[in-house]
Swiss-Prot record:
It comes from Pongo abelii (Sumatran orangutan). The lineage of its organism: Eukaryota, Metazoa, Chordata, Craniata, Vertebrata. Disulfide bonds: none annotated. GO terms for molecular function: ATP binding; cyclin-dependent protein serine/threonine kinase activity; protein serine kinase activity. Required for high-level Shh responses in the developing neural tube. Together with TBC1D32, controls the structure of the primary cilium by coordinating assembly of the ciliary membrane and axoneme, allowing GLI2 to be properly activated in response to SHH signaling. Involved in cell growth. Activates CDK2, a kinase involved in the control of the cell cycle, by phosphorylating residue 'Thr-160'. GO terms for cellular component: cilium; Golgi apparatus; nucleoplasm. It catalyses: L-seryl-[protein] + ATP = O-phospho-L-seryl-[protein] + ADP + H(+); L-threonyl-[protein] + ATP = O-phospho-L-threonyl-[protein] + ADP + H(+). SUPFAM superfamilies: Protein kinase-like (PK-like). ATP binds at residues 10-18, 33. This is Cyclin-dependent kinase 20. Keywords: ATP-binding, Cell cycle, Cell division, Cell projection, Cilium, Cytoplasm, Developmental protein, Kinase, Nucleotide-binding, Nucleus, Serine/threonine-protein kinase, Transferase. It is an enzyme of class 2 (transferase).
Length: 346
């Protein structure tokens, strides 16, 4: 740590504190993630090891945050990353209105290039969300926080935990307890992020896993084996039943979005994971080649992360234009008593 001068604190993650720092000799500005070991015998946390392994296995890519160094410090170690000024969550949070179409296209295009690169290297991120998409001073978007990333098995034989991904961006198969999954979980998250950029607020802001499923089915309709053949094989399929409900056209959910945007969004937000459009294929979608074209990164908003007041908590289920998703949770369930243990009072 002697080679760095700490300039300020950026934030705190699951396994450490992140600082803005300056290299004493070179003057380079970096982000230092300090990971403390609670007990030496516990070893390095798995999430930290996964992040290091994932980033080291991928060659430098302009859409993935660069890990510059790893070194021991006190009772732990430090990861030195390239410094990024802000993140996409800050961009959405500070936008006075939904982003312009050209801006949405630019952010989504950069995200898809990063996701395509990860998937080409057999890396599934498993926690894509706006807060993990960092923005540089030049407007460049880069994927960060690979603490949940794994090398995926193309034959689908490997078992994983389903408790990954932040709830609002968690794929339906994970909500149903799937232990075998692939890059489809990232593609669902990309769709959620795209919808949030178009809408200005999250599409599926559930407070627990059951409510999360309810938000999804209110737009996509009730899943069934006809549209999702693997549904009945999921561990939690029989634990809760939903009333039959038809899907809502995306143009009613996002009436200001272009037909091309809705077509691409609909190819991400599909129940069967293997039917979701691949990131590499999505980059060739007509959405990116119709006016307005994606904005240049230098034309994108870049809010400062440091010195910005803490945002207010999300108020809960929002009204999405003229389409309401804030109906009582019980209206979506066959047996409302099943959700009583999951409902927070007050």
């Amino acid at each position: 740590m002697d080679q760095y001068c700490i300039l300020g604190r950026i934030g705190e993650g699951a396994h450490g504190i992140v600082f803005k720092a300056k290299h004493v000799e070179t003057g380079e500005i970096v982000a230092l993630k300090k990971v403390a070991l609670r007990r030496l015998e516990d070893g390095i946390p798995n999430q930290a090891l996964r992040e290091i392994k994932a980033l080291q296995e991928m060659e430098d890519n302009q859409y993935v945050v660069q890990l510059k160094a790893v070194f021991p410090h006190s009772a732990g170690f430090v990861l030195a990353f390239e410094f990024m000024l802000s993140d996409l969550a800050e961009v959405v949070r500070h936008a006075q209105r939904p982003l312009a179409q050209a801006q949405v296209k630019s952010y989504l295009q950069m995200l898809l290039k990063g996701v395509s690169f990860c998937h080409a290297n057999n890396i599934v991120h498993r926690d894509l969300k706006p807060a993990n998409l960092l923005i540089s001073a030049s407007g460049q978007l880069k994927i960060a926080d690979f603490g949940l990333a794994r090398v995926f098995s193309p034959d689908g034989s490997r078992l994983y935990t389903h408790q990954v991904a932040t709830r609002w961006y968690r794929a339906p198969e994970l909500l149903y307890g799937a232990r075998q999954y692939d890059q489809g979980v990232d593609l669902w998250a990309v769709g959620c992020i795209m919808g949030e950029l178009l809408n200005g607020s999250p599409l599926f802001p559930g407070k627990n896993d059951i409510e999360q499923l309810c938000y999804v089915l209110r737009i996509l309709g009730t899943p069934n084996p006809q549209v999702w053949p693997e549904l009945t094989e999921l561990p939690d399929y029989n634990k809760i039943s939903f009333k039959e409900q038809a899907p809502v056209p995306l143009e009613e959910v996002l009436p200001d979005a272009s037909p091309q945007a809705l077509d691409l969004l609909g190819q991400f937000l599909l129940y069967p994971p293997r039917q979701r459009i691949a990131a590499s294929k999505a980059l060739l979608h007509q959405y990116f080649f119709t006016a307005p074209l994606p904005a240049h990164p230098s034309e994108l908003p870049i809010p400062q992360r440091l010195g910005v007041p803490a945002p207010k908590a999300h108020p809960g289920p929002p009204r999405i234009h003229d389409f309401y998703v804030d109906r009582p949770l019980e209206e979506s369930l066959l047996n409302p008593e099943l959700i009583r243990p999951f409902i927070l009072e007050g």
